[in-house]
Amino acid sequence: MNRAHLLYRDVLDIPADQWLEQHVYLSREVSPNAPGNLSLTGQPWAREILRTIASPYTREVELVMGAQTGKTTILLLAWLLFARFHPQPCLIGLSTDPLADRLAKRRLIPLIQANPAWGDKLPPANQGQESMILYPGQYTF
């Protein structure tokens, strides 16, 4: 298998949580309570989770967390890390189509739109795949 593409892949050279705080902007639509540059000071437990997820040695992460503790935000930030440093097809599955649709429209798409540099890491929309959903910004999920 040709692995030459690995030479040009971005490398995460600082802890994942610090990198995210430096490079992710949260719009008011994504984070109504704390818009602006990402800050994990209010969720210190998220730091270790994101560092673990970003580790090349991690194969699986299981979280047991209470309500309103940032699970969705952690999931979206992990997705951004993978899109940036390990680009490959990714499937985010939820229990129902309306729930998945709402997550994409209310959280994921606004997060991508607030951070234009991430858009170049996503494949362009493929109009030929009827099973895929085309969202604003020409991203296919």
Regions found by a protein language model. Give the residues of each.
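Phosphate/NTP-binding elements of NTP-utilizing enzymes
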Residues: 1-141
